[in-house]
Amino acid sequence: MISFVTLLAILGLLSISWADQTVRSVAGDQRVTDPVIVGDNSILDYYGGSNYDFSNNFEIGRGTLYIGKESYFSSFQSAPTDVPNSFHLLIKNTNNLQNNGQFIIENIKRHANQCSNSSIQVFPINFQNDGEFEIISGGVEGRCCLPTSVIAPQNFLNNGKFYYKVLTDTGSIYSGSCMQNVDIGASTTTTVNNNLWEFTGSINAQINGAVSGAAQINLDGSNMFVNANTFSGQVVNLINGGSFLQTSDPLSNIVVINGLGTSDTGVTSIAVKGKGKSFTYNPSSGIVKLTTVEGKTYAYQIGCGYNTKKFITNNDSGASYESADNFFVLTYSEPYSPQTCQLENSSIFSSNFISTSTSSSSSSSSASSLPSSMSSSLPSSLSSSLSSSLSSSMSSSMSSLFIIPPPYTTTRSSGSSIIDTEIVSFYSTTDSPGHTITGTTTTTLYGPHTHSSVSTPSSSSESSTTSNSSIESSSLPHTSVSSTPESSITPSSNTISSSPTSDFSSVQSSSIMESSSVVASSSVINSSSIVDSSSSSASSLPSSMSSSLSSSMSSSLPSSMSSSLSSSLSSSLSSSMSSSMSSLFIIPPPYTTTRSSGSSIIDTEIVSFYSTTDSPGHTITGTTTTTLYGPHTHSSVSTPSSSSESSTTSNSSIESSSLPHTSVSSTPESSITPSSNTISSSPTSDFSSVQSSSIMESSSVVASSSVINSSSIVDSSSSSASSLPSSMPSSLPSSMSSSLSSSMSSSLSSSLSSSLSSSMSSSMSSLFIIPPPYTTTRSSGSSIIDTEIVSFYSTTDSPGHTITGTTTTTLYGPHTHSSVSTPSSSSESSTTSNSSIESSSLPHTSVSSTPESSITPSSNTISSSPTSDFSSVQSSSIMESSSVVASSSATQSSSVINSSSIVDSSSSSASSLPSSMPSSLPSSLSSSLSSSLSSSMSSSMSSLFIIPPPYTTTRSSGSSIIDTEIVSFYSTTDSPGHTITGTTTTTLYESSIYSSSSSTIQESELSNTSRTTMTSNSSVSISSTSSRSSFSNTKSSTIVISQSASLPDSKTDIILSTSSNIGYSSRSLLSDLGTSISDSDIHHSVLHSTESYSSNESGTNPFTSIASLSNFIPESSSHTSTALGSENSVISSDILTTMSHPVATNSGDKPTTPKRSEQVSTTMTSSGPTPDTSSFDTDGMSAYSRPEFTTNSLEVNKSSTSQLGNNKQTFSNLQLESTRPHSENEVDNNTRLLQSIQQSSTYGTNNVNPLSPTGSISIPLTEDGQGDNNNWNSPATNDLCTQISFNLTATTITVTDRITITDSIHDISSEVITSYIYQTIVDQKTVTQTVDGKSLANKMSSIPKPSSRSLIQPQPPVAIELQEGAASTSRVSLVSLFISIILVLL
């Protein structure tokens, strides 16, 4: 009996579970307007139809919804009305599609082996898939089936699995050449994928709109085209010939792509839109970069361990992917086995897909002919040969002067982590025509480096230029710098550099700052070029000149004289040229490599360079390596031991001692920005001994050192032309021979030597290269003691040699992170003369910063350039402001003044030969020869005009970059015709919203150079007046705000809320000119108003406005305040703001883009009589007396427009400097009061995602037509109430106007901030329903409540009636009831 009872109980439980499961089948075409509900363990089967149209919500529990040609249960069950090979599914006008179970769509009959004319369109507002969503399409071998599928909800949240498959009639995967298209998302939609997408078979999947989340995407024989600017958190797996193609611009993040390789099942590939230029691969990090000829670089993480020789790149017209676009394709020729990435030193493989090089030849200018006067007096062959010889010799000599530009660095970061740092350095090489050109070496240092620790990233090198020269470049060093939380670091000089080629064509390369918070790496230089001046040190001129001189002068001179003259000219020219050129040998600057472990420095290696001579006598570069051993922890300062080694042995007496490395303590939560300005010394023409000393500083003070860079010194005594050969020809009388020899030897040789030396020295002196300035900052704890800036200029010592003078500018502190002060500055100048060159140690500047502050190093330098006539140039570089930033993180950009005084030595550069030339030679020969040499030298030298590299100043706020100012240089000509340097300033604003460009030309022959910036798109005027007066003591503040908004007559409901906050904080600048103010005198005035508008049923309801006034002084409604000051201080502010917001039009039209226009007029005035001389101020300010003071008036007129459509914005930074008299007993009668006025208008938009809790779906109205904000989720119950419901998109617009006035001398500031926040809800779909309360309950779903997951809530169940001919529902309820009765009886 017990076993029987147990059996019956089990049967009862089973019957209960069967009773919970419902199976419904619906056959034929369907147009469903009611919600589709599938409960748990239930099956709803739509089959046998060709057209399905759904226009209401879907709610699928843990059951199955099937829509297809054949039944879910049987392949042989279909409807007689089914249209063969046709299937159309439309899900539209649906708010929510929620799938927690299984949703299958099948557009073909199984085993039919037929193509289907199919279209699947899924357009719900919100699609949330937490289960499995699967589309099965059919493919036929040998035929092209081209169904279309679009899955484009406004908001797509995939927490489950999404499948799209193409199958044959046998159920296998179709992998034919005909690709089926499916679109996921649209440009205006939002997609979040948190689990799995899988495309199987011949599919072209087009991904549109922003995609985010954390998921896997499997491409099994499919192609995926990504046309999105946001594609984050997705890992793409290439399987069986799958391909990833990007048709959008490069992404900010690196996409992870697995499976690139070739196998038996297909070749996988990665492709980007455009034509290929080059690609690089780093085996240690697994990052590959594809660069197109359009200048776009795409980065992908493909994994480590690839063999670089197996990569294949090609350009595809798009035919392989059935696309009209061109693609740069990367494949791998063998299977790939995944390997673990390890950060270690390894070379980066680099390949130029298309080699493009442009070079221009200036042979026509460098080989200029001799003057016509010489041609007329000399034989034509002599004139041409002399011109050719001079040009050839000059060109050969000048080629060794090829100047290699300094390297530059580009750092990419994400948040507080550094992705990679790319260092591009340059070297000299030769192209196929034999021109000397610049090659580049790119070194990439991979991260990430978090801001909480110091890591030593791997360094690797790639070369982007291939040449036949035997120049090898190794990896460049990387100096890691520790930075700490709550700080931002802005690198100083990631800029653009330019350098001339041998034919003096300008080469420019650019570097763009990509990140807003980066750790600057020190600038390092990889010198791999060896200058061989052997061609210019030949003992004689080219043979063509000697033979031409001998043959062509024989007609006018005896043969012996011809040969002697040829020999003398050759020897003199060569000796003078060699002597002059050798002194221009350019020594590269040193570089530093620091190795660290955690927070400790292991050692620092400094490599410096000097000039020496190899065994053949060629002038080469030697290196001196100095190692400073550690460790140096960041909590203390230690003086490391040092050792020095020299890698080149020479005969010259060059002594070098170790260079110093001073480390500065950095506290936690601080940031350090290195300054890497280094100076190197140059040898003299005879390579006299060079001495360098080192200074070791053991305290937390960075020692500054004066560095002298001496240029070439030309000594013509040793380079005088040798006398004519003693064996004068016997054909002439001995007396004539000896006389002519003696005369020509002493006169011609000395004249040629003197003239050449004078011309060469005059020309070469203008090539004197002035080193860039450098900065040394001393700090104590979190305070900066002082900052010393050493800049350089050109001067002359007592023997007349051109040397380098230094100018030292000291900016005194301290500057703490709680305030910004304007330090006083003092300047001293030091000049070192004589030919012996002394060089002190090279500085390594570290800067310590305090918590919540950022420091930007001031390394903006300008070097001078020679004029066209190569006269002496003097320039000085003075840094005018310190780059210390307060907690507001608004960086002050430093200004650099480069003033140059140009001395015109045209009379001396073209000096004629001495008058004591032999009378036997034509008189025109001496003048012509002198003129020819000067002309040729001038023509050759002019192209060596050196353009300084540009520099960049970046202002940041927190982790955001406000703007970046790039100052670049170009060559121009002043009014006297001198070649000078002009500057171009380009300002890049955040998000490239607005940019302005200005040009500045440095005028010559002026003691001071003014800098003028013309900014467009801004209408701002400032007027300042000063007069002595005394007023009655009053203080008022007037604020007027006028706002208006208009709405069209429609049934669209709009919420417009505005909040304005205007007040003064701290002390008023203009009211403190002569009045003491304490904290008790400071009040705050706040005006707050809110407005809301709504429309009634007919759309003509007038607006209602609610305004509140709080904390406004005084209590009267006149909006007048007497808060600041007790007497005789007046400050007024009138702000008039008008706004118009056309946000919606009549029903059926798209809403208009919100616009904003404003006008601001501000007037502030302050005046007062003689103040009290007693002590005042609780903040420690000492008392002072002002017998008289001026009235300062400031008027600011601003007119700006902001339009969201094309992101227009105006931004103004204004400074006003006024002078007021003081008492007679004060030392400085004209103390300057610096006033800084800043105005800015910013706005932002935020399209609220309806899936987030902040979204609003509908607006229920009460009986009187007003919105019930306290009960959003309660539908109206009154029959007469109007209910308006649409598909809404919420847009938030924030506008902030800020006017700040500060007095940095007296620590006074006044600030007016007006903030407008608009939240507008507009009707995107214009779906409007107006019903009474009775029918509302049946036709309108309840308003969903926000949840952490979505706004989609279960709908009340709606019964689905079975159509005629449909399968019956399983009936188990009677059985269950019968068993239950038996159990009860037992």
Curated annotation (Swiss-Prot):
GO-annotated molecular function: cell adhesion mediator activity
Glycosylated position list: 117, 315, 345, 468, 526, 651, 709, 834, 898, 1008, 1017, 1096, 1197, 1229, 1287
Record localization: Secreted, Cell wall
Comp. bias (Polar residues): 1140-1150, 1159-1177, 1198-1218, 1241-1259
GO CC annotations on file: extracellular region; fungal-type cell wall
Position of the signal peptide: 1-19
GO BP terms, alphabetized: cell adhesion
Region (Disordered): 429-507, 530-553, 612-690, 714-739, 795-873, 1000-1032, 1140-1186, 1198-1227, 1241-1269
Alphabetically ordered keywords of this record: Cell adhesion, Cell wall, Disulfide bond, Glycoprotein, Secreted, Signal
Main location: secreted
Function field: May play a role in cell adhesion.
Name of the protein this chain belongs to: Adhesin AWP3b
Gene that this polypeptide is encoded by: AWP3b
